Amino acid sequence: MNTFKVQFFSPDNRISFDEVVSLSVNGLEGELVILAYHSPYLIYLLPGIITAQMSNQTKEKVVIDNGILEVANNNCSIITNQIQVFDHLTHDEESLKDKRVGIYLSYLDVKSL
């Protein structure tokens, strides 16, 4: 199976995936799927979720701000202001949800006094 490497760069973080089979991104021109040995390409990316289909059949999702994607020599580089692995973002949202529930329950306890 043909694969390629994807690297995300931001001022605060760097994420790298080896053995990517396909990469789905949203640019100004619409949705684009990058495959191994894609011709050289440069595109402006819109904020959103980038999905990397890995060779082991898993999917990695990364949330980005506006950015630029470059494809060259079977490598894909994405430069953006902010990057966050989607699983970590989901986990953070769950912890925030738990905190909101706790605050609400505390409010009900005080109100019932």
Curated annotation (Swiss-Prot):
Any one annotated GO CC term: plasma membrane
Q: Where in the cell is it found?
A: Cell membrane
Q: Which domain of life is it from?
A: Bacteria
Alphabetical list of InterPro entries matching this protein: ATP_synth_F1_dsu/esu, ATP_synth_F1_dsu/esu_N, ATPsynth_dsu/esu_N
Q: Which UniProt keywords apply?
A: ATP synthesis, Cell membrane, CF(1), Hydrogen ion transport, Ion transport, Membrane, Transport
Q: Quick check: keyword Lipid metabolism in the entry?
A: no
Function (record text): Produces ATP from ADP in the presence of a proton gradient across the membrane.
- Does the entry feature the keyword Iron, yes or no? no
Record family assignment: Belongs to the ATPase epsilon chain family.
According to the record's subunit comment, the protein's assembly and interactions are: F-type ATPases have 2 components, CF(1) - the catalytic core - and CF(0) - the membrane proton channel. CF(1) has five subunits: alpha(3), beta(3), gamma(1), delta(1), epsilon(1). CF(0) has three main subunits: a, b and c.
Chief subcellular site? membrane
Q: Name one Pfam family in it.
A: ATP-synt_DE_N
Q: Which Gene3D superfamilies match?
A: F0F1 ATP synthase delta/epsilon subunit, N-terminal
Q: In Gene Ontology terms, what is one molecular function of this protein?
A: proton-transporting ATP synthase activity, rotational mechanism
Mind giving the lineage of the organism this protein is from? Bacteria, Pseudomonadati, Pseudomonadota, Alphaproteobacteria, Rickettsiales
List the protein's name.
ATP synthase epsilon chain
Membrane topology term reads:
Peripheral membrane protein
Native source species = Wolbachia pipientis subsp. Culex pipiens (strain wPip)
